[in-house]
Amino acid sequence: MLATAVGSLQELVTEYCWGAIWGRPGLDLKTRSLLNLAMLTALSRPHELRLHVRGALNNGCTREEIRETLLQAAVYCGIPAALDAFRNAADELGD
């Protein structure tokens, strides 16, 4: 039963997040990636942040842009959340 629920949730994520939202006009993938990094920092979601750091690189973001996004988030989300985000991003980037 739980496996079915998880599968259904993943289908929803794939359809809604990756299809409906990421496929919309108005923002390029690079900008969407940087927004997600800032939001995941604010929400303190380290696992998802690491996944989105990889995605950001694949979507054309530079390491400097990722760093600057996390610094920007630090001011508005708080230093503890930003420190966690920097640690996870550094691990993912191999820094």
Can you name each region flagged by the protein language model?
Residues 19-22, 36, 53-57, 67-71, ...:
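Amphipathic alpha-helical segments within well-ordered protein domains
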Residues 42-67:
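Mid-chain, well-packed structural core segment of small domains
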Residues 70-85:
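C-terminal structural segments of small proteins and small subunits
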